Structures are given as C-alpha cells and as structure tokens.
Amino acid sequence: MNRILTAFLVITWLGTAHAVELLNVSYDPTRELWRQLNERFIAAYAKSPGGQLTIKQSHGGSSAQARAVIDGLEADVVTLALEPDTDAIRKAGLIADGWQKQLPNGSVPYTSTIVFVVRKGNPKGIKDWPDLVKPGTQVITPSPKTSGNGKLSFLAAWGSVVSRGGSEADALEYVTKLYKQVPVLDSGARGSTTTFAQKKLGDVHLTWENEARLEVQEAGGELEIVNPPTSILATPPVAVVDANAKRHGTEAAAKAYLEYLYTDDGQEIIAKNFYRPVKPEVLARHKADFPDVKLFPMTTVAKDWNDAFAKFFGEGKVFDSIYKP
C-alpha cells in the first residue's frame, strides 16, 4: 500500500477502531467508479487502526437522489452531480453550512462534461450542437427534472448558443427545436444509456464523458463518441451528510473516505474511469484520454447554480415551457 496513503489513514482514524458502515448516495453513472474506489479504500482501512469498513452504494438521477436523502435515506456521504442538489440537503438541515470549504477545490474531486454518442459510422453526420436539430434526428438525453445529466445536457445546449455570441432568444429557439426531437426522457443517465445502446432508440445520445466511454466500450464497435467543439464544465461535488454521520458515529470514516479522493491513489482511479482528475500532475499523465473540448463554466448561462435551477428547471420555467410530453 502507498506509504503516504498509509500514513494518512493512521492519522485520520487514530482511536476509531470498530466496524463501520457507510452509505454513499451518488448519481446515476458512477457505479463503476465507486466500486473501484471503495475496494481500494476498504482494503486500506482494514490495514489501519480504523478497523473493518463496509460501503454501500445508492445510485439514481441526482436530483431524485437528493430528494431521497431529504426524505430519509440515511446517507453518510453524498456524491451528487450538481451543487444545488447537495445544497438542497444542506437547506434541509442535514449538511453543515460551508460544506464546499471542507475539502479541496471547493469539494470537487473531479470534473467532467457532456459529449455525444452516435451509431457506427455516424450516419447522421453529427459533429456539433447545431447538427442535433437537423430534421429527422432523434436525440436521447435524460430528464432535467430528475437527472444531473439531463440538466447538464440542457445547459450545454443553451450554452452552445450563448457562448458563441447568440442571444438568449436564439438559445430558447434552439432548445425548443432540440427537445421536440427527444422521443423519451428517462429519469437518469444510465436509463438513457439503456434506451440508446440496448433498445437502439435514437440517433445521438447526450451523456457524461465517462458514461460515453463505457457505453462505447460495451457496444462492440456499434457506437462512436463525437466530442463537440464546446460543452459545459461539470463540477460534481462531494459532502459528508453531517447529521446522519454524527448519529451513525461515522463522521471520521466519512471524512477520510472523501479526503481519499484527493490522494494520488484516488485521483488515479478517477482518471482511469474517465473522469477528469483535479490534480494537474495526474491529469497530465492521462492527457490522451481527455480530448481538447472547450469547456465553458455554468456562469456562461446563469449567475450561479441556484439561478440556473430557478430560471431553467423551476416549476413553469424555461424547460416546462418548451417540453410537452
């Protein structure tokens, strides 16, 4: 085991040697990432003064997962897709104020973006966002009401217009056309992957960069990735659910678990699962895995995340005005 990681575990868990169980409530397409991180972390924990550790995972659309925690799902940590989903749990009194400052990089251990997956040979000739609204092109993406992928797909589409000098009226016209070409809205990212890759519905799938890699790997040459010239910068945060962790007696283990994500070991696992690590030296080692897409921040489309949620995804707001199931 890495000496630095060993020292980190000893310091963090000194005096906490007992069996511990954590529940990590995460967003939809992170199953494979967390299985690998958990396996490595549990092995390290077993060799430390911390004792035995079990980590359970729960996955679904990010906003739906946040609601589940607020409604009583006993998460010790949340690793959701979007800051407002995590902050909604804070507003419910379960996460302490200032949670973004508890871990490095604003509690964001990796970044990602939205890319396109197309059929073999790219028969629709899809290269950029305007191609998605060509007549006869069916687009698969999850619901912005329940899914982080869905929200980011919408914001990336909107931002693809305004980041290139288009007006908000132009962006509204574009997303109105786009969502008329979406035949079904699944509740989460993995459901949309199933719809596109297994049920073979649609011509292009808007999805997380990491999910696209996995989807194409499993498709046996039947699918391809198209990296658009520009897309949104996704910054999924992590946080301890303080009220639950305190009640469970898991605060130290939960904190160490999330701190592990920022170690070289954790960042390497993150990179190998096609999430963009935040440590520059780790990202540099995996540069070939991450195409040079111009990523615009969320502030390109709204003042902040709360503004984006209220403006685009609130009841009766922009998305509701353009999408009629």
Regions found by a protein language model. Give the residues of each.
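Sec-dependent signal peptide recognition
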Residues: 2-7
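Sec/Tat signal peptide C-region and signal peptidase I cleavage site
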Residues: 13-19
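N-terminal segment of the mature folded domain
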Residues: 19-147
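Ligand-binding cleft/hinge of the Venus flytrap
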Residues: 39-49, 130-195
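A bilobed periplasmic-binding-protein/Venus flytrap-type ligand-binding module shared by bacterial periplasmic
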Residues: 114-122, 235-252, 269-273
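Short helix-loop capping/hinge motifs at secondary-structure junctions, enriched
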Residues: 121-127, 146, 159-167, 244-252
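Ligand-binding pocket segment of bilobal, Venus flytrap-like solute-binding proteins
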Residues: 164-229, 237
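Extracellular/periplasmic juxtamembrane helices and adjacent flexible linkers that interface
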Residues: 245-325
